[in-house]
A protein has these predicted regions:
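C-terminal regions of proteins
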Residues: 3-157
Length: 157
């Protein structure tokens, strides 16, 4: 979400940061591009607790009180696809609330301190897929082929 959601709808803009979502909206808004975010109230995720650490299955605790995850859970604990374009002028939707950021690095111990990004949903995304309870993906165990160059060759060297 920190990559695809428009950075101008978060606190990233105060830090002078931008992302793919913002660039796509600025340069391709008339091309039918749709920014789709993701949120979950609780479940499990595959991530590492710091850069360079091994991946592991981690528990994702319920969304923080007042966060978008909590609000969507309280609205009915079923999965939802929210089309947000028509909510851009509705104060209930444009209010900035915390939205959980889970990436390849995630540490539930810092859940209340650094895993939430203040977000105006309809300004950040065109749509949001909300899964009330998510389950981590199962890793694919790829067997490398010795005589074939890596997929990123030569850039991955």
């Amino acid at each position: 979400n920190t990559h695809i959601g428009d950075a101008r709808a978060t606190d990233m803009v105060q830090a002078g940061e931008f992302n793919i979502g913002q660039l796509v909206r600025e340069h391709h808004s008339g091309d039918g591009v749709v920014l789709v975010g993701f949120a979950t109230n609780r479940g499990t995720v595959v991530a590492a607790d710091e850069w360079g650490a091994p991946m592991e299955d981690m528990m994702v605790p319920p969304g923080a009180p007042g966060s978008w995850e909590d609000v969507l859970h309280q609205a009915g604990n079923q999965d939802k696809l929210l089309i947000l374009r028509d909510k851009a002028e509705n104060p209930q939707w444009t209010e900035a609330r915390g939205q959980r950021a889970i990436g390849v690095v995630y540490n539930p111990a810092f859940e209340r301190y650094g895993n939430y990004v203040p977000t105006s949903l309809p300004r950040r995304y065109d749509a949001l897929l909300y899964i009330d309870e998510s389950h981590s993906l199962h890793q694919l165990h790829v067997v490398p082929q010795i005589n074939v160059p890596p997929e990123l060759y030569p850039w991955g060297i």
